[in-house]
Amino acid sequence: MRINLTTSDPEVSIREKKNLGRIAQIIGPVLDVAFPPGKMPNIYNALVVKGRDTLGQEINVTCEVQQLLGNNRVRAVAMSATEGLKRGMDVVDMGNPLSVPVGGATLGRIFNVLGEPVDNLGPVDTRTTSPIHKSAPAFIQLDTKLSIFETGIKVVDLLAPYRRGGKIGLFGGAGVGKTVLIMELINNIAKAHGGVSVFGGVGERTREGNDLYMEMKESGVINEQNLAESKVALVYGQMNEPPGARMRVGLTALTMAEYFRDVNEQDVLLFIDNIFRFVQAGSEVSALLGRMPSAVGYQPTLSTEMGTLQERITSTKKGSITSIQAVYVPADDLTDPAPATTFAHLDATTVLSRGLAAKGIYPAVDPLDSTSTMLQPRIVGEEHYETAQQVKQTLQRYKELQDIIAILGLDELSEEDRLTVARARKIERFLSQPFFVAEVFTGSPGKYVGLAETIRGFKLILSGEFDSLPEQAFYLVGNIDEATAKATNLEMESKLKK
């Protein structure tokens, strides 16, 4: 894949090109611009409006060409607010699509859709930039080998493993631990895979973006003293931004991730929160451009827009981009065109459960609702597959028995069912795990558990080897050896109390 890197200064290119047009019409965030005959900009070219408003304040608005209308006019969508613009203002054709800074200089910083830093930490090195519109990697460049992306999180690796270079949907309401799970994944990919992460905040609340940034600084994911040692770059296009910015901010984040994959040859985690807002912004832009709406009022190009973004997220022979996308489901309707189109691209789903969070089991990943296309014997191996299936069967049986237990109590169950319940409760607790990024809040050190250790632990619980241990010993530990050590400590404590 050709990385089209430019090292030009935008001001120099303005002076060189001087392809000037004038604003002919403004409708909200959409501008019609007239250019001289034979000087029409290309689709997706960046246009810059510079001037002063009626109060003498400087205006600097970047737009993206979306349509060529004829009569030497183009229609462009603004990437920032259009207040203060008026007809007749000069518009400069930059001659290229939007380009954003890429590489190590982006780590630890917050950018907007244009690749401008918005964290008041000074300018960013823009000698290496890359256009946000690119083709997906060619078929011959793809790495077609199916391999698991080990996260070090037991419940994910065992029951709904992530595919290296795959796409994962993250489902969960407010307050069930999405942010902490995201931060732990960012931390683990940096430590175990030497990789980096890019976080794309697409159309979500500014407060949430700010909270995430503060928590990342607190947990060490962003290193304030030495930004180069940070593990993540942040790109935000929040709810208050115009639809053009919300529609393109995902591509800005993806472009930064592609550089780490293709040039630095690293494994990259790309977070998109929220993929539904990307579709929603596309729908708004589509209506503003006058396109005929499709089903439920969505844009007619919904599948194309989603495919263009998702096909660039993949493994190549150099590195991989594994994407975790938070999915908002409007009115809990999974048949809505936005989530339905997203599902077609997902390799795995991680569903967070409020019930588990209420029990204090973190990460609150629902072991029965979360799925993965990777959980097949030919991919993960017979041992992993069998262990995962047995764990699910045990938990499913426990779920079925809960009504009986609530009405009649445990004593009314058969001996076999009582054993199943005891093991299921141990499994449920063993699926919890202390996180590195939560150390500052909980005081207990984080644990990274390798896949082989995870499988060994659950096999031993299922075999009945630890039927005599108290279930509390399995709560918030790393591997199975820590659980046995905790059981010994609990036994000693109870003896001392006596």
Swiss-Prot record:
The keyword Phosphoprotein applies. It is a peripheral membrane protein. SMART domains: AAA. SUPFAM superfamilies: C-terminal domain of alpha and beta subunits of F1 ATP synthase (SSF47917), N-terminal domain of alpha and beta subunits of F1 ATP synthase (SSF50615), P-loop containing nucleoside triphosphate hydrolases (SSF52540). It catalyses: ATP + H2O + 4 H(+)(in) = ADP + phosphate + 5 H(+)(out). The keyword Hydrolase does not apply. Its main location: plastid. It comes from the Eukaryota. Pfam families: ATP-synt_ab, ATP-synt_ab_N, ATP-synt_VA_C. One of its GO terms (cellular component) is chloroplast thylakoid membrane. GO terms for biological process: proton motive force-driven mitochondrial ATP synthesis. The modification Phosphoserine is found at S13. F-type ATPases have 2 components, CF(1) - the catalytic core - and CF(0) - the membrane proton channel. CF(1) has five subunits: alpha(3), beta(3), gamma(1), delta(1), epsilon(1). CF(0) has four main subunits: a(1), b(1), b'(1) and c(9-12). PANTHER family: ATP SYNTHASE (PTHR15184), ATP SYNTHASE SUBUNIT BETA, MITOCHONDRIAL (PTHR15184:SF71). This is ATP synthase subunit beta, chloroplastic. The lineage of its organism: Eukaryota, Viridiplantae, Streptophyta, Embryophyta, Tracheophyta. The gene is atpB.
